[in-house]
């Protein structure tokens, strides 16, 4: 299906997990197995499974987890949310079981936003947003993971989103809480204090000057389209 999605409803992750781990520069080993090939996903959509990095006793885990999560008491009442608002994630009831111990990182290369078309405001134009220096991004995330051979329906993750007034392409929009590698390391440090976590949530998002963006093909609206042409400027 074709849909125009708000922030942050689609993103790309196309390097190998080793590249993201190298940029994090953690002195921790990944204690579970993961794929070393390039991930090559240019259009990650909600409810699909995608790689996240999370702390584990003795190191890190890399897991493929469904993007979208609800607590057990809200399952099936609506579509699982894919984002958690920075303003309420620490205090709200909905994410209580994930905060703060479900902290994870969703590595990415960029994300998409849809902006009303100047020529025809009823239509929307997708834009792709990436780091101006071309390096990887780390989205602050919260995850519930139940490892096993089969995906567990309780497992899922959400991306934390930053306040609307710091939007990029569209001033009214929200953006993922994008962390520098330094803050990303802190985010998944088991020893971090809740006060420091609150600081990162409130002020840790990389500034809009760190990013560049450009219009891309409307093909990204269809989740079946997955190739690198989706992130080429039009």
What residue ranges belong to the model's regions?
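Short linear sequence motif anchored by a di-proline
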Residues: 1-234
